[in-house]
Amino acid sequence: IESAYFRNKFEPELGRFIGSYLGIGVISDMESQPITVTSHLGRFAVVTVGRIDNLEEISAQLLKEKIHFAEMSGSAINPTEVVSILINKGETFKEGIENVYRMVKGSCSFLILTDSCIYAARDKFGRTPIIIGKNEFGYVVASESSSFTNLGYNIVRDLGPHEAIRVSKDGITPIIAAGCRKQICSFLWVYYGYPSAYYLSLIHI
């Protein structure tokens, strides 16, 4: 979904979800998402939320390495494509996520969808939240909890800064432990957060 807060109908797309129990999405004001990649890691899709302060620096380095960008947003490089390239530089998804943490300055939380699971990674300072929910049918991860009640999910917990998990039909598997450094942006929560959302499992905006 691009430049829209809601879509009230998804009928044309519903047939594409038959037989699948996994999915990701994002509302983006700027770039088109998700980005789909086929590489040595297999076929995967990526969505991101946040701001990459050193996007130009990373992009310039990748161009020196003769890597091209195809998912342009107008004349600008798509930040989500940059994240997908950094992920793809790892030998595993864990290494790829760690590469994003190492290279990106700013705030970038993201989800990776594969054929069998979803990886959820919160930015290294915890500025953009990722919250886990659960019901009798499975799990959900989102940037805020406001939709959980209407969909029948209970809040499990927030991911910590620099934390990454793997979500599959078998449950949740830790991938990267949470870091100790947290620099939350309460203004972001107040400005963008829905009134019924909870943050850190206890702050009600």
Pin down the residues of each PLM region.
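Conserved short alpha-helical segments that host acidic/polar catalytic motifs at enzyme active sites
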Residues: 1-161, 166-202
